[in-house]
Design a protein with these regions (language model features):
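Active-site/ligand-binding surface loops and adjacent short beta/alpha elements
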Residues: 120-122, 130-172
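Short, hydrophobic/aromatic beta-strand segments
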Residues: 15-17, 119-125
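Residues that act as N-cap/strand-start positions at coil-to-secondary-structure junctions
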Residues: 10, 44, 64-66, 92-94, ...
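Short, well-ordered beta-strand segments enriched in hydrophobic/aromatic residues
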Residues: 4-6, 100, 107-116
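Acidic/His-leaning functional-site neighborhoods
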Residues: 2, 18, 57, 63, ...
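Hydrophobic residues embedded in beta-strands of well-ordered beta-sheets
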Residues: 13, 76-78, 107-109
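Extended, loop-rich substrate-binding clefts of extracytoplasmic carbohydrate-active enzymes
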Residues: 55-104
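Beta-strand-rich N-terminal accessory domains
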Residues: 1-52, 56
Length: 172
């Protein structure tokens, strides 16, 4: 049986239990998050600054959604609506909905970004769940739905992709 817990801060998953076993990282060591939502950017931007429509905006790694209090619409349905604070970092009017549902034995996470502005909006969106794995058992593997071509490992320099250095880490 699958059970989840969430919180309003960042609309973040705090627990995924399968038959009583916790599957999500506890957030106590190494990293103080468990499953942050990355919006309106994924990753870093150079010098934490971007130019939009001729104006400079500062935004930290992965954007601001993970650090904001969402409104809870119903159990496991959260919404973040633009406000004075978000407009200082991101000049677009939006609603970000995060909906968690358990369907049979599967957790489904649905993200909806609604443009409530009178212009196009641009954004990146991602989930960053950290799973609890006991690597000492050797019971884990990554399985792809279909054969993958080469996957490149991109090296980072100051948190940004160093385009001069990339290595193939998976072939066939």
């Amino acid at each position: 049986m699958l059970k989840i817990k969430t919180k309003k801060q960042g609309a973040e998953l705090t627990s995924i239990q399968c038959d009583g076993k916790e599957m999500l990282f506890d957030g106590k060591t190494f990293w103080n998050r468990q499953s942050p939502i990355l919006f309106p950017i994924v990753g870093r931007i150079k010098d934490s600054k971007t130019e939009i429509e001729g104006q400079i905006y500062e935004m930290s790694q992965h954007g601001f959604a993970r650090d904001m209090e969402f409104n809870q619409i119903e159990e496991n349905h959260y919404v973040l609506t633009y406000n004075e604070e978000t407009l200082k970092k991101y000049p677009y009017k939006f609603e970000l909905h995060v909906i968690y549902q358990i369907i049979e034995d599967t957790l489904q996470v649905e993200y909806q970004v609604k443009n409530i502005d009178n212009k196009k909006i641009y954004f990146g969106l991602g989930g960053h769940p950290a799973f609890s794995c006991d690597y000492s058992t050797g019971q884990y593997e990554i399985v792809f739905d279909e054969k993958e071509d080469k996957i490149k490992f991109l090296k980072l320099k100051n948190g940004l992709i160093d385009t001069e250095k990339a290595n193939n880490i998976l072939e066939n």
